[in-house]
């Protein structure tokens, strides 16, 4: 694949346990990365990993979900990482529609680059 797109809800500062379990299954030496004398080397052919999420609160650049997916992209050898987050949907219900529309527009623009 040229790109990997992961979409998940933002729950309790991260993403669902089922997705974490999936990551454990695919994070395997010889499958998504390997080791050389120089250290860990990614084994994925994808050029881009995109993390899409939405949630009731606001996710930031330094939140667990974003950091984890950014680090996994690097570990797997995927050079480009982006994320789109529609956050604060419960915290600011009056602007939830605008927030979703902005995130969808950002995701659509990003999809054109894949």
Locations of regions flagged by a protein language model:
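Helix-loop-strand module that forms the ligand-binding subsite of alpha/beta enzymes
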Residues: 1-67
């Amino acid at each position: 694949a040229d790109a990997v797109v992961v979409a998940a809800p933002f729950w309790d500062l991260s993403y669902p346990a089922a997705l974490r379990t999936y990551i454990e299954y695919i994070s395997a030496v010889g499958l998504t990365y390997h080791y050389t004398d120089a250290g860990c080397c990614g084994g994925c052919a994808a050029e881009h990993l995109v993390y899409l999420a939405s949630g009731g609160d606001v996710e930031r650049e330094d939140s667990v979900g974003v950091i984890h997916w950014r680090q996994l992209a690097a570990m797997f050898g995927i050079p480009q990482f982006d994320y789109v987050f529609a956050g604060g949907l419960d915290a600011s219900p009056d602007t939830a529609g605008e927030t979703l529309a902005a995130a969808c527009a950002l995701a659509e623009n990003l999809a054109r680059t894949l």
